[in-house]
């Protein structure tokens, strides 16, 4: 597993859980119940796409885990580049008790674990579904499960980097939980080494699941940057299987390992 020298944030956060009324059996016009969503194979495609959309939010890779908080903590920016943001100013000085940076950290934590919960829901539903429910059979089912497991691993890994100590520090305190089932309201906190072991386990399983698609069936979609990113080459099975460069693919999983 690659090593990252990242600031350790000793912050205890609570996940907030929301409940809905059992008697309300009417779906909002812009939402679909999980039962309806997973009735067909296409619903699994939509659910996976929804996970990618959630990960692109400003709380995660749309800002904080890319050019936002993560870059501030790595001291990428000069002081005068971030003085207008009190949250980032506090982060740069590792002053995590300030209200503004607390709000940012809480949003990363809650949004990250929400993504993980959605990955777990998708995995459990797909594993319980016969491969005949998917247009491309076992190939598609395995690809969806593989991507979801790899995304779950990556999300845990980035939460670990922010909220737990480095292995090299020798600190074996247990800081974050690792969720693999849905629903699950509680999992015990684990040490950094324990989390990394689970991340590696998920990634190894994911690599095996996506391998046939990315290295045998649709190798052309991985052949060049144009094919991976631009979709200039038609993928076997349709558009869902194209543009692998913007999805969790075999090469990306190996890079994480």
Task: Spell out what each predicted region is.
Residues 21, 204, 251, 256-257:
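Aromatic-residue-lined binding/catalytic grooves and analogous aromatic/hydrophobic interfacial grooves
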Residues 45, 86-163, 184-194, 204, ...:
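Conserved, well-structured interaction surfaces
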Residues 1-7:
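Bacterial N-terminal signal peptides that target proteins for export
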Residues 217-243:
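Surface-exposed intrinsically disordered loops and tails
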């Amino acid at each position: 597993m690659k090593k990252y020298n990242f600031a350790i944030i000793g912050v205890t956060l609570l996940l907030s859980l929301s409940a809905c009324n059992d008697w309300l059996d009417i779906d909002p016009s812009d939402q679909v119940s999980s039962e309806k969503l997973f009735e067909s194979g296409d619903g699994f495609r939509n659910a996976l796409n929804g996970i990618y959309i959630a990960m692109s939010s400003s709380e995660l890779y749309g800002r904080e885990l890319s050019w936002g908080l993560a870059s501030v903590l790595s001291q990428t920016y000069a002081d005068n580049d971030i003085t207008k943001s009190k949250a980032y100013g506090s982060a740069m000085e590792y002053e995590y008790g300030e209200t503004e940076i607390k709000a940012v950290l809480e949003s990363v934590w809650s949004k990250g674990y929400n993504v993980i919960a959605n990955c777990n829901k998708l995995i459990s539903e797909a594993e319980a579904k016969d491969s005949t429910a998917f247009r491309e059979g076992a190939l598609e089912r395995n690809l969806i499960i593989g991507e979801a497991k790899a995304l779950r691993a990556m999300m845990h890994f980035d939460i670990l980097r922010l909220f737990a100590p480095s292995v090299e520090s020798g600190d074996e305190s247990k800081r974050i939980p690792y969720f693999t089932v849905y629903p699950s309201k509680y999992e015990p906190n684990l040490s950094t080494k324990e989390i990394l072991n689970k991340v590696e386990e998920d990634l190894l399983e994911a690599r095996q699941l996506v391998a046939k698609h990315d290295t045998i069936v649709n190798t052309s979609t991985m052949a060049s940057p144009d094919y991976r990113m631009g979709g200039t080459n038609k993928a076997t099975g349709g558009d869902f299987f194209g543009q692998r460069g913007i999805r969790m693919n075999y090469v990306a999983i190996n890079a994480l390992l």
